[in-house]
Structure formats: structure tokens, C-alpha cells
């Protein structure tokens, strides 16, 4: 099959759009800032389709399983992985910010900071308890969960629906087939939406540069440098080691998901590429049931980039404002962030909101210090989103392998770019077709009774 021209590839189009957006925002700031609706509109288009895609993927995956015990095993192993890796991310961020000390010497007087920009974030008492977090997973109603697009609530209902349909055996087959066909239609819609991805990336980047300006980067370059370096260390060191231990290369995985990474870079939201990630993980050999559980859950429980950002930003503010933060305070902050970091979704700005809520609840680090990083938070959002996205990609393949739900031969062939005929496997992301993602589930429901 002849490869399509480079300029027709999504990653190339998005990359060019980002470059044009940066140029427009830099040279014509007001015009660039006015492009915000383009980026927002694209994100809304993607979010519009995420909840039904999660529902269909999980229901079809669970209903088609022969052993329902695998669902609980998959979920348990996924949460275990998320907790361990996100804790490592928090600790690495804490270590680097203490060694690099980007805020030391700034000697900022908190009383002189303009806190108008952070007023809407710094509301006291916003931190959720563990009980609140767990209770919020249960939706008030199914309609409300889908209307809000709350991934954990949709995930919860989808698991129940899939389990119930599984128990019906052959009687549930018509519903199974209907939902399977619906999933094909939904992924077809994603393919249509992805046609305007370059426009969304252009609008988001033009707004970012036009609104905040490249000049705002220089003022806090030390913090940004430390954060970006930490993300690279985490991806290549931690995630790279995890990937190598489980039989695949982190570099090859990054190359495999490069189109999605450019999309995430342009929109600063890992959520923007969620549907394509799910399809690509299936294409790489992970079973649909595992992908359906791990990927959506990871968008709340496995935000590695956000975890790094939270510890680094909190300690940076303490350093810049000369706020004493000894080892005991930092350990306390770490423990609290282990809980509050789970409240961040894979959307732009969620990390800043969680940081504000955490500082408001802890009280050790001045909340007013958030004004120091407000101007560069949008630029740090790219690294957060990219790290989150790569982290969830690795998590999906690792958990799939733990659950014996990964076709290692298929994974190696895909990551090594050895799959010459896309017709060999129907669960494919058709990059040479017009960017339409069409997953396929070959097995019907069987009567387990």
C-alpha cells in the first residue's frame, strides 16, 4: 500500500498549524487572542463524543468476556499501577525542585502580589475527602453523568451496564450488536472531527501566545526549565524502564502515537486525543475490555505530568516567598497531593485548579503565591498533558500484559512498523484512510449459563 504524502498526515498538519499559531500570536497578539473560540470549539467537539465512546467500548468489552472475574482483576491491577507510578512522579517532582531550587532568591513579598487573577481558583475548603471522592463516582442520574461528561461516573455506569448485559447471555445479543454498531458510528464521527484538528491546534496556540506572550516565559524560565527537564527524565527514565521491563520501547511507543502527541501539544489537553488513544492501544494488541477500563480511569488516577507539576509548583511558591517548608511539611504535602491529584481531569487548566484547592486546604504555602505561576501555567500545561498522555499509553500496555490480555507479537509488529497490510487485523487506526478510527469486536455474546 502506497504511503500518503507527508503533508496529508495529521501530525504534519497539526505541527504546521501550531507553528502558524505561534507566529500569529507573537506578531499580532490581539488577533491571536481572538482565535480562542477555534481551540475551545475543537475541545468541545471531542468532549461531546468521549462519554458515549467510553460507554460503548466498556459495555462491548465486558459483555463479550467469558470470565467476569477478569474485570475486577483488571481494575485492581490498574489502580495499583496508577498509585505506584503517580507516587513516584510526585516524589521525583519533590526531589528535583529541592535540588534545582528555582524559587530560591526571588524574595517575593506575598502582600505585593496581584491576586485578582487567582481569586476564582483560591476558594477555601475545596479539597475533597476520600469519602467525597468515592461518593462522587456514583452519579445522581445516568443522564446527569453523560450531560456533565464525568468520565468516572460514566465508567461506573458502563461497568454495571456491561455486567448486567453479560448476565443475560444470548438474550442480550441484540443489544450487544446494537451498541457495537453504535461504537463504529461514534468512531466514524471522531474521524470527521479530526479533520478540523489542525484548526483547533492553531486557535489554541495562537490564543496562548497572543494572550500571555513569549516574554512571560523568561521571567520564570528556571521553574519551566526544571519542570520540562523533570518530565523528560520521568518519561525516559521511569516510564522507559517500566516499558523495557515489559518488553517494549518507550521511544517506539512515542513514535507510534506521534500524531496524538502533536494534537495534545496543540490543544494542551490530553483528553483531546482520548478516542484515538483507545483505538491505537487496541491496534497495538491490547484487548478492548482492558483498554476500555484502563484508559478512561487513567485520565483521573494516572496523571503523571500533573503530579510532577503539583509538587514542583507548591515548593517553588514556598521558596519564592521564603515560606519555611521542612521535610515534615513536604511529606504532609505529598500525602495530601496523593489524594487531591486524583481530582484532576485530563483537561486544560485542571492542574492549576487542583493546586489552588490543595494550597487553600493545607494553609502552609500562601495561596497568593499562585499569582507567580499564573502567567506561565498555560505554557507548562503542554508538558503536563504530554506526560499524562504517554503515561496512560504505557499504563494500558502494562496492565494488559499483567492481565494476559496483550498480543505481544502484534504489539511488537505495530511498534516496529512491520504491519504492511492493515487488513490483517480489523482493530486498526486507519492512518492511510481519512483518519477514521474503526474498531471491531469479532466475538458475540455467548450464553454463560
Curated annotation (Swiss-Prot):
For this protein, the parts annotated as crossing the membrane are 5-25, 45-65, 77-97, 149-169, 185-205, 231-251, 298-318, 332-352, 353-373
Pfam families assigned: SDF (PF00375)
Principal location listed in the UniProt entry: membrane
**What biological-process terms (Gene Ontology) are attached?**
L-aspartate transmembrane transport
Instruction: Name the domain of life.
Output: Bacteria
Q: Which UniProt keywords apply?
A: Cell inner membrane, Cell membrane, Membrane, Symport, Transmembrane, Transmembrane helix, Transport
Gene Ontology MF: a single term: succinate transmembrane transporter activity
Family matches, as Gene3D superfamilies: Sodium:dicarboxylate symporter
- Give the similarity note: Belongs to the dicarboxylate/amino acid:cation symporter (DAACS) (TC 2.A.23) family.
**Role description:** Responsible for the transport of dicarboxylates such as succinate, fumarate, and malate from the periplasm across the membrane.
Record protein name field: C4-dicarboxylate transport protein
Q: Which organism is it from?
A: Dechloromonas aromatica (strain RCB)
Q: Lineage of the native species? A: Bacteria, Pseudomonadati, Pseudomonadota, Betaproteobacteria, Rhodocyclales
What is the gene called? dctA
